[in-house]
């Protein structure tokens, strides 16, 4: 497996985890667990920024 394929797999994993975190956050908001949700959303945002950076790098490599 080449580096590009590995980066895509890692990016897909992070995006999947982010989606799961957002679903959990939605449930916690319904239970008024605002501080927990805030921390989880900050972690999710960092993960998504990492994915965005990796995808930009991947795009640059494939051009």
Predicted segment positions?
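N-terminal acidic leader/helix
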Residues: 1-32, 56-60
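Coiled-coil-like amphipathic alpha-helices with heptad-repeat character
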Residues: 1-3, 23, 41-44, 51
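Amphipathic alpha-helical coiled-coil segments
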Residues: 46-63
